[in-house]
């Protein structure tokens, strides 16, 4: 089970503390919290009182007290020392793409506790990366995987179990086993997409959630909120969705991968006019940003355009029948 830190210990050391240990949380309240998908302190500590009140059917004042107590017991929300943060960083795992050039570009692989945005034009290979990492996530840790379950939110009807089967066989894996650990839902509009993020939280009990994929993140928002008059509302909704995804990454020590569409800036005087959808909201929410483009001979180019700790750079790889390869 996922564990949370106590105030008496170092900020990120884990020990088994249950929601019943919170002051004022009796059996009835604990049952409501669990029915709403809250099993641990960290999940409560990152909620807002209004959201917790709505999800768990509690009063807002009660919710505020529960959240405050959870933050105190998990020692979240105050200043911490740099060495404590370094200890937290040691918990980060890396999911290998099993493509050496991509792993080298990312300093060893795709980090957990991070939101990775992959953007590019149609046919640049965004969905292929999502499928490949979904397969790889089910691998044992000593083989570059996370030995975890994957949740895949499909907004464009592009998930193909047949492709997962091809990639699994390319790694010598049992396709049925791999598919059993990938949980897929089709999102039909932006509201449904946001609800599915909440559903992941509820379904995570009993599963080792290690990866969440949204393919693609912005397509519904872009189609439903049209024109400058709707831009502020679109960005507000998108920001809320991104925060929910980041919470899932933090609470589960998981990787969130989102694919994104692009548009061309006709007024660009120099450089590449291709820009990702989502504006500054998505740019600030993304921990890492990868820009994919096609190259000659069926090759793809991945460029790391934003990272908190790695230099910009690019690599070349191929999409084959068996999956991604150098």
Identify the residue ranges that each predicted region occupies.
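Single conserved hydrophobic/aromatic residue that forms the stacking wall/gate
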Residues: 1-12
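A short amphipathic alpha-helix within small helical-bundle interaction modules
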Residues: 19-22, 33-55
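The Walker A/P-loop phosphate-binding site
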Residues: 32, 69-177
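Amphipathic alpha-helical transducer elements in NTP-driven molecular machines
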Residues: 96-99, 103, 112, 127-128, ...
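Conserved catalytic network of the ASCE P-loop NTPase/AAA+ motor domain
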Residues: 108-110, 141-146, 171-178, 202-207, ...
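Conserved inter-motif catalytic segment of the P-loop NTP-binding fold
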Residues: 145-230
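Phosphate-binding/switch region of NTP-binding enzymes
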Residues: 235-239, 243-326
